[in-house]
Regions:
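Short acidic active-site motifs
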Residues: 118-119, 137
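A bilobed periplasmic-binding-protein/Venus flytrap-type ligand-binding module shared by bacterial periplasmic
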Residues: 44-57, 160-177, 192
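Short, glycine-/small- and polar/acidic-enriched structural segments
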Residues: 1-106, 110-112, 125-139, 146-159, ...
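Short gly/pro-enriched beta-turn/loop segments at secondary-structure junctions
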Residues: 159-160, 201
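Conserved C-terminal helix/tail region of periplasmic/extracytoplasmic solute-binding proteins
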Residues: 258-339
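Secondary-structure end/capping motifs
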Residues: 174-285
Length: 339
């Protein structure tokens, strides 16, 4: 934390607070208790592929991609899929997509970690065949003529949870008033970003060197909800655009944390006997979100009555029931579950 010249909180991939709190993704498996205080957005990520596969016009169906990469591997060439952090959201999206297309992400392709700003450069030199990342890197890939968008992640799971606002538990416990002020500030920012009239201004802010440090032109279209896939397919005001406040985007449903942990079990990052519900109960502080929302004057109708968003249906027909995560896990054909 800040007492040791570190940080107390962050904009973070949704499952990471659980993985850090449990020690699953920390050095020497040291547990660092954290709290999820809000969700920051829904959807808005993309899976891109290189121009090597341009003729395939790969989309949500990865079956043709499966055939192409199998042939490439058979010729002795490496095949790589890049994401931003093991067990994180981008890792989960690209693994889900690959597996749904019959590609085993642990056997049929190498999964590598690449920081978001380095994705395009690595694709350009042929270090990877596909990647999953946030914007503006997918759009930048198209603008530089290096690849195209296969799908937006909302096409895999409509209005899926993505980033979270999380803080160290010791800071929150010691500073309840400051924590509430921070949550309310985040909520107000989410409301501002949700308004279409503000999207261009937000894009200009994000383009600055101190933030994303990328051309405005690479950011603005998709922030407005307009998606040019780089294949001739163009969708304006996409239903899969990123949401910041609408559709209860800010609320940290515990059911969503359960899905991410179930997927981490699916891919062997967590053991099958990992007590998901216990950890979610420790890490998810929806109670603090509710308090901040009420203090901010958020309408009661905009404050979810349940900790669960209910059944979640994916593009391949799979259904996740937060009341029975193991049934969902058992239904998945491709997985790497450890004891």
């Amino acid at each position: 934390g800040s007492q040791r010249n570190g940080i107390d909180g962050a904009h973070i991939l949704t499952p990471m607070p659980d993985l850090i709190s449990s020690g699953a993704m920390t050095a020497n498996n040291v547990q660092v208790p954290m709290y999820i205080l809000a969700r920051l957005n829904l959807a808005g990520q993309c899976i891109s592929v290189g121009n090597e596969y341009k003729d395939l016009k790969v989309g949500v169906d990865a079956s043709q991609f499966r055939t192409a990469i199998a042939a490439k591997r058979a010729s002795g060439k490496p095949v790589n899929a890049a994401m931003t952090f093991p067990g994180g959201t981008h890792d989960m999206w690209i693994r889900y997509w690959l597996a749904a297309g019959g590609i085993d992400p642990t056997r049929d392709i190498s999964t590598i970690v690449v920081p978001p700003p380095q994705m395009v450069a690595n694709m350009k030199v042929g270090s990877m065949d596909t990647f999953c990342v946030c914007e503006p890197w997918n759009r930048q890939l198209i603008n530089q003529g290096i690849g195209y968008t296969a799908n937006t992640t909302g096409e895999l799971w409509h209005n899926h949870p993505e980033k979270a606002f999380a803080m160290r538990a010791d800071y929150v416990d010691a500073n309840p008033n400051a924590t509430q002020a921070l949550i309310k500030a985040v909520m107000e920012a989410q409301m501002f970003c949700e308004d279409p009239a503000n999207r261009e201004e937000v894009a200009r802010i994000c383009a600055k060197r101190r933030w994303i440090n990328a051309p405005f032109e690479d950011i603005v279209d998709r922030m407005r909800g307009d998606f040019d896939y780089g294949t001739g397919r163009v969708v304006e005001n996409s239903p899969q655009q990123m949401r910041y406040w609408k559709d209860q985007a800010s609320y940290p449903f515990q059911s969503h944390d359960l899905w991410f942990l179930t997927e981490n079990i699916r891919w062997g990052y967590l053991p099958k006997d990992f007590d998901m519900k216990a950890w979610v109960g420790k890490v998810n502080r929806e109670d603090l979100w509710r308090q901040a929302a009420k203090d901010l004057g958020v309408a009661a109708s905009d404050i979810p009555a349940s900790t669960s968003r209910g059944l979640e249906t994916f593009f391949d027909g799979k259904v996740f029931d937060p009341e029975n995560p193991m049934a969902y896990l058992d239904s998945l054909a491709i997985k790497t579950v450890r004891g």
